[in-house]
Amino acid sequence: MNWPLALGIWAASYLAGSLPAGYLAGRRLKNIDIREFGSGSTGATNVLRTLGRGPAAAVLLFDVFKGLFAVWLARTLAGGEDAGAWIVLGAGLAAIVGHSWPVWLAFRGGKSVAVSVGLLLGMHWPVALTVAAVWGVCFAVTRIVSFASIVAAAATPLCFYLWRAPLPFTLFGLLGGIYIVWRHRGNIERLLQGTEPKIGDPAAH
């Protein structure tokens, strides 16, 4: 592996992942720190509850694009490397960590679900569609974004395996899935208590 190249790609992926679209939307539209409202997250769900559908859609698309960019960057610069898939794995992990712990916001960001969607699309689009279907079914049944995200994250490594994706991508699904579930630990507590809000509720996600 070309370590200087890999480290540069991973650093760029972290910085891209850490771009705080939700925070900037809050500052631009209402001059608020969105982390002080709702769930305290900078992600699209909290933006939806705090700022409305239009800003939430824009933040969602931007966060998905961050994931796509990280994979594109890794594949473009390291595509010819024998270790290219492993560099993509590192870029993916760096992007989700950047979104959750952005250097620009004192390491307090979102839960990395949307950026992970972009990463899955860039790595293996059939897996992305399968995981999206899992999310969609769970959300349709419960109307709870966090529950759908947790189940989809847990299903991601299995989806990579069933689609016979390269080992580094399956490993990303495992590590990234565990990370996202861990980021939702507060939501899990509320789910167990029966207090986790559904979409449309004023309470925080």
UniProtKB/Swiss-Prot annotation:
Disulfide linkage: none
Any Pfam family matching the protein: G3P_acyltransf
UniProt key word Lipid biosynthesis: yes
Record's catalysed reaction(s): an acyl phosphate + sn-glycerol 3-phosphate = a 1-acyl-sn-glycero-3-phosphate + phosphate
Annotated TM spans: 5-25, 54-74, 87-107, 117-137, 138-158, 162-182
Pathway annotation from the record: Lipid metabolism; phospholipid metabolism
MF-aspect GO terms: acyl-phosphate glycerol-3-phosphate acyltransferase activity
UniProt-listed GO biological process terms: phospholipid biosynthetic process
The keyword Oxidoreductase appears for this protein: no
E.C. designation(s): 2.3.1.275
Record keywords, A-Z: Cell inner membrane, Cell membrane, Lipid biosynthesis, Lipid metabolism, Membrane, Phospholipid biosynthesis, Phospholipid metabolism, Transferase, Transmembrane, Transmembrane helix
Subcellular localization(s) per the UniProt record: Cell inner membrane
GO cellular component: plasma membrane
Membrane topology of this protein: Multi-pass membrane protein
Main location: membrane
InterPro entries from the UniProt entry: G3P_acylTferase_PlsY (IPR003811)
Top-level taxon in the UniProt lineage: Bacteria
Cross-referenced SMART domains: G3P_acyltransf
Subunit structure: Probably interacts with PlsX.
Family, as annotated: Belongs to the PlsY family.
Function statement: Catalyzes the transfer of an acyl group from acyl-phosphate (acyl-PO(4)) to glycerol-3-phosphate (G3P) to form lysophosphatidic acid (LPA). This enzyme utilizes acyl-phosphate as fatty acyl donor, but not acyl-CoA or acyl-ACP.
Name listed for the protein in its UniProt record: Glycerol-3-phosphate acyltransferase
Gene source species: Gloeobacter violaceus (strain ATCC 29082 / PCC 7421)
The gene coding this protein: plsY
